[in-house]
Curated annotation (Swiss-Prot):
The lineage of its organism: Bacteria, Bacillati, Bacillota, Bacilli, Lactobacillales. The keyword Nucleus does not apply. It holds the Pfam family tRNA_anti-codon. HAMAP family: Asn_tRNA_synth (MF_00534). CDD domains: AsnRS_cyto_like_N, AsxRS_core. This is Asparagine--tRNA ligase. PROSITE patterns: AA_TRNA_LIGASE_II. It comes from Streptococcus pneumoniae serotype 4 (strain ATCC BAA-334 / TIGR4). Its EC number is 6.1.1.22. Homodimer. GO terms for cellular component: cytoplasm. Transmembrane segments: none annotated.
Length: 447
């Protein structure tokens, strides 16, 4: 019995006969030769079958029958294919399989997603099948590399995984984007972020991170928004603002390096410019203040490439502004110290300037916009209560959060990153819907 291996590992078996469990992604050939494009989730590569070889091995009757099976294979038929691994310099993968035997496991008739072009709605309706395509597999491999690198980075930096709840009894700071559900007769809400709970974790464990799904009822149809997505939140006690920015920069660079190391073929499939990714890792990220960014936007608003509306100090950025800023510097760019009026209640003011808060958004270049948001948290009980009263917030909804300031408060801060936005940036894809297996968007909840 031959050894069963995955496609990605065939390089270790050159000259040997192996068996691979795979699906037929495509098929071509004529006469005495057949070419199979095979995939198994780890990689794609080609298998070649020669009719004379089958006749020689199995005899004329059985050999012709087996070769006829290969000729009749349809797209996405599942098979066990056996063959000799050979190096192939013509192939991007570098190897091919000289097929010696095949066994059909599951037939596939009239597969909906043929090699021709299909519309987006059709592909999204068949997302469960579209996932199998070469480019979609590549994007999900990059997603996997980013998730793996996330756990690796925080483990190396002394953070503990801390699981915050998905159901919450209190509305977060933006109640207009909440999904509400009934919790045994009491209103409950799907989590928008685990941050408030992570702050409790940081007071117990020092450094914590959470990774899980969050939900925002955003009635937005842009290429950067989902109603359900995966968020990594980190929280760190005894932290300064500069230390937080350093950590965020190191984290994003670790994610990019993780993709380069663990998913090089996926990047090649997507034709991602890896030299750009390497430059983002090598060069320091740019850091500017919100007010410097506004000044810069005003200075260049009449430039030919300035496709954005005029902003005054105090206004929030839109996507065109974020795109222009990050493209202007050509590297990921931190915009720091936003106006308190457009940021969350828990953010700590800039010392000596209460109109600005110690926060930063990291803007990715190439038009990908914000991928990280972070801030120092207000650790002073009286200052936080005053801010909540100013905004008309109900303190009773945040009793546990205020307790953190009453019992051993410390300087602390953190940040969050939407994994799908990071995947989109790393993969170089145009729309966030491809960065998650089953996207949930406005008007899209199936399959």
């Amino acid at each position: 019995m031959t050894k069963r291996v995955t496609i990605i590992d065939v390089k270790d078996y050159v000259g040997q006969e192996v068996t691979i469990g795979a699906w037929v992604a495509n098929k071509s050939g004529k006469g005495k030769i057949a070419f199979l494009q095979l995939r198994d989730g780890t990689a794609f590569f080609q298998g070649v079958a020669f009719k004379p070889n089958f006749v020689e091995k199995f005899g004329e009757e059985v050999g012709l029958e087996k070769f006829d099976v290969i000729k009749r294979l349809s797209q996405e038929t599942s098979v066990y294919v056996t063959g000799i691994v050979k190096e192939d310099e013509r192939s991007k993968f570098g190897y091919e399989l000289d097929i010696t035997d095949i066994e059909v496991i599951g037939e596939s008739q009239d597969y909906p997603i043929t090699p021709k072009e299909h519309g987006t709605d059709f592909l999204m309706d068949n997302r469960h099948l579209w996932l199998r395509s070469r480019k979609q597999v590549a994007v999900l491999q990059i997603r996997n590399a980013i998730i793996y690198a996330t756990y690796e980075f925080f483990d190396k930096n002394g953070f503990m995984k801390f699981d915050s709840p998905i159901l919450s009894g209190n509305a977060a700071e933006d109640s207009t984007e909440l999904f509400e559900t009934d919790y045994f007769g009491t209103p409950a809400y799907l989590s928008q972020s685990g941050q408030l709970y992570l702050e409790a974790g940081a007071m117990a464990l020092g450094r914590v991170f959470d990774f899980g799904p969050v939900f925002r009822a955003e009635k937005s149809k842009t290429r950067r928004h989902l109603t359900e997505f995966w968020m990594m939140d980190a929280e760190y006690s005894y932290l300064t603002h500069d230390e937080s920015l350093d950590l965020q920069e190191a984290y994003v660079k670790a994610l990019l390096q993780g993709v380069l190391d663990r998913a090089p073929q996926a990047l090649e499939t997507l034709e991602r410019d890896t030299e750009l990714l390497k430059r983002y890792i090598a060069e320091p990220f740019k850091r500017i203040t919100y007010d410097q960014a506004i000044d810069l936007l005003q200075e260049h608003e009449n430039d030919e490439d300035a496709d954005y509306e005029h902003l005054e100090h105090g206004d929030d950025f839109g996507s065109p502004h974020e795109t222009w800023i990050s493209n202007h510097f050509g590297v990921p760019t931190f915009v720091m110290n936003y106006p308190a009026a457009i940021k969350a209640f828990y953010m700590k003011p800039v010392p000596g300037n209460p109109e600005r808060v110690l926060c930063a958004d990291l803007l990715a270049p190439e038009g990908y916009g914000e991928i990280i948001g972070g801030s120092m948290r207000e650790e002073d009980y009286d200052a936080l209560v005053a801010k909540m009263d100013e905004l008309g917030m109900d303190r009773t909804e945040y009793e546990f959060y205020l307790d953190l300031r009453k019992y051993g408060t410390v300087p602390h801060g953190g940040f969050g990153i939407g994994i799908e936005r990071m995947v989109t940036f790393a993969a170089g894809t145009k729309h966030i819907r491809e960065a998650i297996p089953f996207p949930r968007m406005l008007h899209r909840i199936k399959p």
